[in-house]
Amino acid sequence: MNPEAVVNYLMEWSRQKVKEAGALGIVLGVSGGVDSAVAAIIAKKAFPENCMTLLLPCESDVVDRMDSQALVEKFNIPYRIIDLDNAYHLLSTQFESYLKCEGLKGKLLRGNIKSRLRMMALYYSAQARNYLVLGTSNKSELCVGYSTKYGDAGVDLQLLGDLLKREVYELAQFLGVPETIVNKPPSGGLWSGQTDEGEMGLTYEELDNYLASGDGSPEVINKIEGMMAGSQHKRKMPPVAMIPPELRN
């Protein structure tokens, strides 16, 4: 991969999509992870005067908060911090007052509340400014549905959606993303100790190898193909019940 050429292409692509939408710029969330770091730097390059980043802590790890702020300040990217803790606690308490799930399912439910709150904050900011919401998911995540429906998957543009995780790391090195971000285990930050690979039950190396070449152990291939099949609904618009013509007569 030619990192410089890819970055230039993504800059022009994002400008074209914003123009087509009649929008003025881009807003995105910065989490402290490598994907959002790469997306934020490219967005700033593409829209020097019309790029806004939101830091949206919600029971977030303090290291992620510090890394997020250090990144946007290093690259002189405009940002706002919107603490979602109070909104999250209010909603989760209300929801769990009538239906509470324990264990992993409970963690996933609560984590998805956080992701959807962030989506709401991003779209509020985008609509107020006539901006588009820029997603930060990579191809590896999108292919297996590793995202929250109407949460981090609720965006207008997926800048990194055709890049494998390892290719995102290549861009991160080229763009000068701080090592503190590049070297940390990828995590959605949905609960304490959560990591992408731990939740998926796969390493990104295994996933990227399969997506790039179809290679992998039988167990890995079966798992990936099962995840791809089970998450198709996340990559499609909701089905519409088409009324047969004879029922309209």
From Swiss-Prot:
It catalyses: deamido-NAD(+) + NH4(+) + ATP = AMP + diphosphate + NAD(+) + H(+). It is an enzyme of class 6 (ligase). It holds the Pfam family NAD_synthase. GO terms for biological process: NAD biosynthetic process. InterPro entries: NAD/GMP_synthase, NAD_synthase, NH(3)-dep_NAD(+)_synth, Rossmann-like_a/b/a_fold. Its EC number is 6.3.1.5. ATP binds at G29, V30, S31, G32, G33, V34, D35, S36, T136, K165, S187. CDD domains: NAD_synthase. Mg(2+) binds at D35, E141. GO terms for molecular function: ATP binding; glutaminase activity; metal ion binding; NAD+ synthase (glutamine-hydrolyzing) activity; NAD+ synthase activity. Deamido-NAD(+) binds at R116, K149, D156, H233, K234. Catalyzes the ATP-dependent amidation of deamido-NAD to form NAD. Uses ammonia as a nitrogen source. Homodimer. Belongs to the NAD synthetase family. This is NH(3)-dependent NAD(+) synthetase. It comes from Syntrophomonas wolfei subsp. wolfei (strain DSM 2245B / Goettingen). The gene is nadE.
